[in-house]
């Protein structure tokens, strides 16, 4: 017979696996399928886009490009800054490249096009947050102090006129007695319940 501990362990493992699959995403580099190219202007650089995205462990980057004239190279930080296409960490030339982000930290990608696309801005740095990295909280809001009250004292209100005493002739009627039907019904219902329970216990004892 399978132990309860084994069943619980398998259920927990399956839950954890499906949870991480649900969190993982496939992200188009640059925000669209045709963004892996020389940017139109510095304001549209791939790094500007990457800074606006929160990358997590398990995500995947999708590069789409013309494999006849371009490629994707994953390089070191030094080669990234120099646009050095020699000895990359990984080289992709299939035109539809998916790169899995398995660990946290920075990833550096440059274009391998011989026309020098990297120097023209076709490169991107992706920083993957650690699983325990806290999410940014909301900006602090400075409380607004209420305006100070006016120091000029207000004039006192005139005293109300004193009403003339009148003799009260009306008498208050006594409150009616509360109804007893609901309480009686509750007591009767409890009596029936306990009587039935007692009969059932006696029947089981002599069965």
Curated annotation (Swiss-Prot):
<feature type="glycosylation site" description="N-linked (GlcNAc...) asparagine">
    <location>
        <position position="43"/>
    </location>
</feature>
<feature type="compositionally biased region" description="Pro residues">
    <location>
        <begin position="144"/>
        <end position="164"/>
    </location>
</feature>
<feature type="domain" description="Phytocyanin">
    <location>
        <begin position="25"/>
        <end position="130"/>
    </location>
</feature>
<dbReference type="GO" id="GO:0098552">
    <property type="term" value="C:side of membrane"/>
</dbReference>
<feature type="lipid moiety-binding region" description="GPI-anchor amidated serine">
    <location>
        <position position="181"/>
    </location>
</feature>
<dbReference type="InterPro" id="IPR003245">
    <property type="entry name" value="Phytocyanin_dom"/>
</dbReference>
<comment type="function">
    <text>May act as a carbohydrate transporter. Required, together with ENODL11, ENODL12, ENODL13, ENODL14 and ENODL15, for male-female communication and pollen tube reception and burst at the synergid cell surface of the female gametophyte.</text>
</comment>
<keyword id="KW-1003">Cell membrane</keyword>
<feature type="region of interest" description="Disordered">
    <location>
        <begin position="129"/>
        <end position="179"/>
    </location>
</feature>
<dbReference type="Pfam" id="PF02298">
    <property type="entry name" value="Cu_bind_like"/>
</dbReference>
<keyword id="KW-0732">Signal</keyword>
<keyword id="KW-0336">GPI-anchor</keyword>
<keyword id="KW-0449">Lipoprotein</keyword>
<dbReference type="GO" id="GO:0005886">
    <property type="term" value="C:plasma membrane"/>
</dbReference>
<keyword id="KW-0325">Glycoprotein</keyword>
<feature type="compositionally biased region" description="Low complexity">
    <location>
        <begin position="165"/>
        <end position="179"/>
    </location>
</feature>
<keyword id="KW-0472">Membrane</keyword>
<dbReference type="InterPro" id="IPR041846">
    <property type="entry name" value="ENL_dom"/>
</dbReference>
<dbReference type="InterPro" id="IPR039391">
    <property type="entry name" value="Phytocyanin-like"/>
</dbReference>
<comment type="similarity">
    <text>Belongs to the early nodulin-like (ENODL) family.</text>
</comment>
<feature type="propeptide" description="Removed in mature form">
    <location>
        <begin position="182"/>
        <end position="207"/>
    </location>
</feature>
<protein>
    <recommendedName>
        <fullName>Early nodulin-like protein 11</fullName>
    </recommendedName>
</protein>
<dbReference type="GO" id="GO:0009055">
    <property type="term" value="F:electron transfer activity"/>
</dbReference>
<dbReference type="InterPro" id="IPR008972">
    <property type="entry name" value="Cupredoxin"/>
</dbReference>
<feature type="signal peptide">
    <location>
        <begin position="1"/>
        <end position="24"/>
    </location>
</feature>
<keyword id="KW-1015">Disulfide bond</keyword>
<feature type="disulfide bond">
    <location>
        <begin position="83"/>
        <end position="118"/>
    </location>
</feature>
